[in-house]
A protein has these predicted regions:
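Short, small-residue-biased leader/transition segments that mark boundaries at the very start
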Residues: 1-8
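Asp-based, Mg2+/Mn2+-dependent phosphohydrolase catalytic module
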Residues: 9-186
Length: 186
């Protein structure tokens, strides 16, 4: 049995894109679809009934459930699609176990990112297209925030939140225009 302190020597059953598997492999997590320590759910096009069923069985057998982020939906070239929160929900419902969301808006993720960048939150800006993850994670981490309207949140949905971004832009391209001193179409 692996000791609790061997965080980077853990085994996981991973439902996710190759980038997630590579990142986990890079920190020493090995893949195991028989008796893993964790079931880790990210976003992937290969999500199907078989992998959900396997994940449910593994969680019921003691694996801890982790999800990469709590985004319910996300933008694609074809419109809005289910994101990680929607993909992990059937596993949570079938097992009665709640996933630990390690990505935005998790403060640990934000603090770790700032530390790795050797950056203080007062000198950082969080840019994103979602009020419920991107903007709130920036605000709760002490950063200025920029909401871009090229994704999920709209000017109308901003009004439904008790907090506001520092700035609203039409898209990330407007950041370059602002840096050059050009006027944006805001």
């Amino acid at each position: 049995s692996r000791g609790r302190g061997d965080v980077y020597k853990r085994q996981a059953y991973v439902i996710g894109a190759p980038g997630l598997l590579n990142a986990l492999y890079d920190v020493g997590v090995t893949m195991n679809d028989v008796d893993p320590d964790y079931v880790i759910v990210g976003e992937t096009a290969s999500y199907n009934y078989e992998v959900i069923t396997k994940a449910v069985r593994l969680v019921l057998n003691g694996a801890r459930l982790i999800a990469t982020n709590s985004d319910l939906t996300g933008p694609t070239a074809f419109g809005i699609a289910p994101a990680c929160r929607a993909l992990v929900a059937p596993i949570e419902m079938a097992t009665g176990k709640q996933a630990y969301f390690c990505g935005k808006p998790n403060p640990l993720m934000m603090r770790t990112g700032l530390r790795l960048l050797h950056c203080h939150s007062a000198d950082a800006v969080m840019v994103g297209d979602r009020m419920d993850t991107d903007v709130i994670s920036g605000l709760e981490s002490g950063m200025s925030t920029v909401l871009v309207l090229s994704g999920v949140s709209t000017r109308e949905t901003i009004k439904t939140y008790a907090y506001r971004p520092s700035m609203v832009l039409n898209g990330v391209g407007d950041i370059v225009s602002l840096a050059r001193g050009e006027k944006t179409e805001d």
